[in-house]
From Swiss-Prot:
<comment type="function">
    <text>Tyrosine protein phosphatase which functions as a dosage-dependent inducer of mitotic progression. Directly dephosphorylates CDK1 and stimulates its kinase activity.</text>
</comment>
<feature type="compositionally biased region" description="Basic and acidic residues">
    <location>
        <begin position="290"/>
        <end position="310"/>
    </location>
</feature>
<dbReference type="GO" id="GO:0004725">
    <property type="term" value="F:protein tyrosine phosphatase activity"/>
</dbReference>
<comment type="similarity">
    <text>Belongs to the MPI phosphatase family.</text>
</comment>
<dbReference type="Pfam" id="PF06617">
    <property type="entry name" value="M-inducer_phosp"/>
</dbReference>
<dbReference type="Pfam" id="PF00581">
    <property type="entry name" value="Rhodanese"/>
</dbReference>
<dbReference type="GO" id="GO:0110032">
    <property type="term" value="P:positive regulation of G2/MI transition of meiotic cell cycle"/>
</dbReference>
<keyword id="KW-0131">Cell cycle</keyword>
<keyword id="KW-0132">Cell division</keyword>
<dbReference type="GO" id="GO:0005634">
    <property type="term" value="C:nucleus"/>
</dbReference>
<feature type="compositionally biased region" description="Polar residues">
    <location>
        <begin position="322"/>
        <end position="335"/>
    </location>
</feature>
<protein>
    <recommendedName>
        <fullName>M-phase inducer phosphatase 1-B</fullName>
        <ecNumber>3.1.3.48</ecNumber>
    </recommendedName>
</protein>
<keyword id="KW-0498">Mitosis</keyword>
<keyword id="KW-0378">Hydrolase</keyword>
<feature type="region of interest" description="Disordered">
    <location>
        <begin position="76"/>
        <end position="98"/>
    </location>
</feature>
<dbReference type="GO" id="GO:0051301">
    <property type="term" value="P:cell division"/>
</dbReference>
<dbReference type="GO" id="GO:0000086">
    <property type="term" value="P:G2/M transition of mitotic cell cycle"/>
</dbReference>
């Protein structure tokens, strides 16, 4: 063993740091296996060489008793050209290049692996998410200055190593922890293990979403970047150095910290509500948590027992002003009730119908009511009279109101010749009605009396109503609304068919010829053709007249 140790010390250092690191690991593993001869059989599964090496490194002493070892320059991890100091000159001469964790480690004696100990591993992919970082609520730490490191490490100047390519990580190490770890006689040692860091990361913090990052976790990240051995170097060497009493004290204090509140500088949101929401938020304090700087979306809920003088005064004034009003309204409620303002929705529908009926009782120019009694018929816009009313009108019963009666028979000539009412005019074409009534409008000789026009056909269902509407439209077109030449127009209900059986004495000849008589089919076709032609011509003339007006 001594010869192999001497040969390894005299071997020249290699330029490749990764190969030197693996060679040293194998050499240390061989030394440990040669020393550990007492354990020949283990009930558990044998450890791999790298795991065995990790267990050996976990029991190594941090202090050499001589010159204290310097902490790595953690601020220059992101710089590829940043130099990393090597071991002391005696280590360099021996040709051994240790890992970043091994710079602080020295063999204290023989090592016998513990059979009950199991290596704690963390997944390589989740290393960044598991490792904690310093929160904003932790005490302020001082960064190790480069000047102090240069003064205390003059003896370590020598061969430099290239820093591996890795993402720069900003770390803040407490000065007290650095002093306690690397001083020859530390007074207070800080015991921080990876397990406790993982537990703290799981608990999290309500203010910062970034997990804290400590020195041990940073070393694990660097080992992972070097050669992928982060899974095997998860145990902190400081846990092995501390005595059982100190570990117990630290574990109890850690339990108190974990069971207590997470933040010692937590600020209640209720206190922030007192801050004015209108205050400018352009200059936010960097130490103020982000969630407390956000604008409040809801109005702050005031306690029920908070009575301001203004509110009390306002309540008293309103209550005092309402009391006399209530006293004044009480007798009015007993005597008379207030009437609601009338709106269109409150009007009774029956009243509206009555008013409409009243307007419908007026003649076309809205100046007088109808002189003859009317009844409802098939066409709601026209006024109907019965045969009895027409017979009374012919007999002169309405002579005091009516000056002259015009009975217009809208049937075809062969129907008119077959039987018609006495004194009726046969006008079955629209042009004939226009020429008779509108070319020279007729007026009553006496203002108190009226001119009445009564239309009818065989049933008063089609031809009579059409002629009545035509005359009203032409009359409206020739006069300014609502003036009319003939404001009073009527329809004989049931037509000649219903009037002839009851009043034959008022018909001449006393007979009845229907429209669809077998003897007058040819004449029926001829008159229908003429009527359609006249209607087409009339529409054409109306269109031409409208174009001329434009």
């Amino acid at each position: 063993m001594a010869e192999s140790h001497i040969m390894s010390s005299e071997a020249p250092p290699k330029t490749n740091t990764g190969l030197n690191f693996r060679t040293n690991c194998r050499m240390v593993l061989n030394l440990l296996r040669e020393k550990d001869c007492s354990v020949t059989f283990s009930p558990e599964q044998p450890l791999t060489p790298v795991t065995d090496l990790a267990v050996g490194f976990s029991n190594l002493s941090t202090f050499s008793g001589e010159t204290p070892k310097r902490c790595l320059d953690l601020s220059n991890l992101g710089d590829e050209t940043a130099p990393l100091p090597t071991e002391s000159p005696d280590r360099i001469s021996s040709g051994k290049v240790e890992s970043p964790k091994a710079q602080f480690v020295q063999f204290d004696g023989l090592f016998t692996p513990d059979l009950g100990w199991k290596a704690k591993k963390c997944p390589r992919g989740n290393m960044n998410s598991v490792l904690p970082r310093l929160l904003c609520s932790t005490p302020s730490f001082k960064k190790t200055s480069g000047g102090q490191r240069s003064v205390s490490n003059k003896e370590n100047e020598g061969e430099l190593f290239k820093s591996p390519n890795c993402k720069p990580v900003a770390l803040l190490l407490p000065q007290e922890v650095v002093d306690s770890q690397f001083s020859p006689t530390p007074e207070n040692k800080v015991d921080i293990s990876l397990d406790e860091d993982c537990e703290m990361n799981i608990l999290g913090s309500p203010i910062s979403a970034d997990p804290p990052c400590l020195d041990g976790a940073h070393d694990d990240i660097k080992m992972q970047n070097l050669d992928g051995f982060a899974d095997f170097f998860s145990v902190d060497e400081e846990e092995m150095e501390n005595p059982p009493g100190a570990v117990g004290n630290l574990s109890s204090s850690m339990a108190i910290l974990l069971s207590g509140p997470l933040l010692n500088q937590d600020i209640e949101v209720s206190n922030v509500n007192n801050i004015s929401l209108n205050r400018s938020r352009l200059y936010r304090s960097p130490s103020m948590p982000e969630k407390l700087d956000r604008p409040m979306l809801k109005r702050p809920v005031r306690p029920l027992d908070s009575e301001t003088p203004v509110r009390v005064k306002r309540r008293r004034s309103t209550s005092s002003s309402l009391q006399p009003q209530e006293e004044n309204f009480q007798p009015q409620r007993r005597g008379t009730s207030l009437k609601k303002t009338l709106s269109l929705c409150d009007v009774d529908i029956s009243t509206v119908l009555d008013e409409d009926c009243g307007h419908r009782q007026l003649i076309g120019d809205f100046t007088k009511v109808y002189a003859l009694p009317t009844v409802t018929g098939r066409h709601q816009d026209l006024r109907y009279i019965t045969g009895e009313t027409l017979a009374a009108l012919i007999h002169g019963d309405f002579s005091s109101l009516v000056e002259k009666i015009f009975i217009i028979d809208c049937r075809y000539p062969y129907e008119y010749d077959g039987g018609h009412i006495k004194g009726a005019l046969n006008l079955h074409r629209q042009e004939e009605v226009t020429d008779y009534f509108l070319k020279q409008p007729l007026t009553p000789t006496m203002a108190q009396k009226r001119l009445i026009i009564i239309f009818h056909c065989e049933f008063s269902s089609e031809r009579g109503p059409k002629m009545c509407r035509f005359l009203r439209e032409e009359d409206r077109a020739r006069n300014e609304y609502p003036s009319l030449y003939y404001p009073e127009l009527y329809l004989l209900k049931g037509g000649y068919k219903d009037f002839f059986p009851e009043y034959k004495e008022l018909c001449e000849p006393q007979s009845y010829c229907p429209m669809h008589h077998q003897d007058f089919r040819e004449e029926l076709l001829k008159f229908r053709t003429k009527c359609k032609t006249s209607v087409g011509d009339r529409k054409r003339r109306e269109q031409i007249a409208r174009i001329m007006k434009l």
